[in-house]
Amino acid sequence: MGEVAKEEVEERRSIVAVNPQPSKGLVSSAVDLIEKAVVYLFHDKSKPCHYLSGNFAPVVDETPPCPDLPVRGHLPECLNGEFVRVGPNPKFMPVAGYHWFDGDGMIHGMRIKDGKATYASRYVKTSRLKQEEYFEGPKFMKIGDLKGFFGLFMVQMQLLRAKLKVIDVSYGVGTGNTALIYHHGKLLALSEADKPYVVKVLEDGDLQTLGLLDYDKRLSHSFTAHPKVDPFTDEMFTFGYAHTPPYVTYRVISKDGVMRDPVPITIPASVMMHDFAITENYSIFMDLPLYFQPKEMVKGGKLIFSFDATKKARFGVLPRYAKDDSLIRWFELPNCFIFHNANAWEEGDEVVLITCRLENPDLDMVNGAVKEKLENFKNELYEMRFNMKTGAASQKQLSVSAVDFPRINESYTTRKQRYVYGTILDNITKVKGIIKFDLHAEPEAGKKKLEVGGNVQGIFDLGPGRYGSEAVFVPRERGIKSEEDDGYLIFFVHDENTGKSEVNVIDAKTMSAEPVAVVELPNRVPYGFHAFFVNEEQLQWQQTDV
């Protein structure tokens, strides 16, 4: 067998076709009746569900490719490719509770080629979604259900359905709604409770779910929504967290897509570990006190994840090719939580982490009828340093609230970079602007709000009633030989005044208030999570075997 043929066989083996085998019938109907009775008795449906209304509400249908969209301005040549953003879009209304993290993953994609734009939106065809389509209704528990005794009951309902083979959990139960990344010829849709789903971008910009990626059965645990690709080695670094030991498992995936042996990371308890970071020689794990506490859920009527403000924040720095965690160095900093890191690198004896640091997180803030608020919500850009020689740790505040979704020119991942691009939050879930930080400049003392000056080099304000999403940096030229900020920021925008959505492109160097391009979209695009840009070269190199 020739080398090309061997490679094609390997690719076919690595993508798993998802064909769950749920079961309708008397057993399924009986379980449904029990659930309906308990929901009727114990769930308060009178409270409106904020995250199913307004522009959080799901769109009813997928959108096949809509070509030749109206473009104001021009789309630069470096944007030839597919801009994609994923987010929650529940296909079926929930039986009871609903948390913003619960919805089925829908990818909104814009194919750009030769100055023209095509829009499409498609569900990530997860095992969970396929089964609920089969039943024509929800059958899997939701984060929004997991409070109090009612939460315990909903957990038991899912376990019962699985035991009776009403639902098939053999392919996982994730939604694919959180983030996207490209590695070894594959665009991956991610949610941290599941394995990656492979999504193919078709020539016309359409999106097709090919199946699950289990790395030839070497991946048996969950997979973070925020793996890291080293642009200098083309390797991908990832981990999964669990509610039973080992609570964290670290993995390295070669540039050829081969997953190496698991490395269990020892931490004292089950925590939510949403992100991590890599440098040239290290991986950084974050043991932060947002604990998985089912007992507290039942006793205190709390959400199943609860934050302990009395505990320190711990950061573990591990040589990134370590065979076990015996060489990990743990550092402590004041109590906090972190959803998203920007980058990390090494300076002498120190490992430097640039991150968005959050105080007193409460996942209930984006749950059910709870409207988003900014009171007591402190999410700020920070620099953290870990001295590998002395064991000392320090941190420095780089901004006031509220900043999130930090992105960089990803050609600099693992290396020291100068600029960070983030979103300015009007409230917990709405983005009112895009901000550019210069890490070579000092923050202005005494600032009470985010404004240009000091280390804030530019702000793109979306205007009243207009809200955006994570902005992705696209360089004019890939690599680190050109100017770091020579490129564009691309992101989705929704105008609540008109009900219309669009894609904006702005100049990352100047942060001019005048967009380089505005692409008018045919449909509303709900607020969502993370975005990614697949360049033309990556599109042409997609591994397409099923």
UniProtKB/Swiss-Prot annotation:
Q: Which domain of life is it from?
A: Eukaryota
Cofactor binding remark? Binds 1 Fe(2+) ion per subunit.
Q: What is the lineage of its organism?
A: Eukaryota, Viridiplantae, Streptophyta, Embryophyta, Tracheophyta
Stored InterPro entries: Carotenoid_Oase
Q: In which tissues is it expressed?
A: In vegetative and floral tissues.
Q: Where is Fe cation bound in this sequence? A: H226, H274, H340, H530
What this protein catalyses is:
all-trans-zeaxanthin + 2 O2 = 4,9-dimethyldodeca-2,4,6,8,10-pentaenedial + 2 (3R)-hydroxy-beta-ionone
Its recorded name reads Carotenoid 9,10(9',10')-cleavage dioxygenase
